[in-house]
């Protein structure tokens, strides 16, 4: 029996990267999964992977920054699977790499809409179902960029710092309810959102240096974040609440430096 057997879960940003890895991991451990993404094609691939492995999943194409869409996929989970036990608000965007003084208000609004308002809407619409049941796990993807300066672009970093505060506030709002709210703060993970970083390093012949600023001396992989998400989703994390967990190879544990050798 898997650690999520019988649970109903929603994973946003499930078309690739961390979201896909987490949706697959949840299904492997017995959850019925609603996979959400803006890309119908990518979602179809994720759901096919889950089905091929013997899991249960349905796809919902939706924009997490649209409240009606979020309400819709939460309702779809309840209708299809009979309830909601876990929601992983993972979908996010990086924005562009423009210098701070050249960034537009529109850029900030879009990054905040997806990265911060999206998790807020997931909490807003999922929590009432969990509160009525007296249990549930809400997980949000923040970032090491929300903990340490210079780990991400300005609007991205600000949005992820906001997610950490949102999680802490929500956990205390749902005091003594059985509903837990936590965040995962990934470091440099090899996903679509970091593809440009890896592509630039490859073009310069410095791909082997990626991740050298953390003590583990390498970048992370999506499944390593999915494993943390699985723990937080499971009953094994029953006493874990209101926390933001760096999964970054140790990057946030110290000041960056370039090791010798």
Segments from the language model and where they lie:
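Alpha-helical segment proximal to the catalytic Tyr-Lys
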Residues: 128, 172-176, 238
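Active-site helix of classical SDR
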Residues: 123, 159, 167
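Substrate-binding pocket helix/loop in short-chain dehydrogenase/reductase
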Residues: 98-100, 107-109, 210
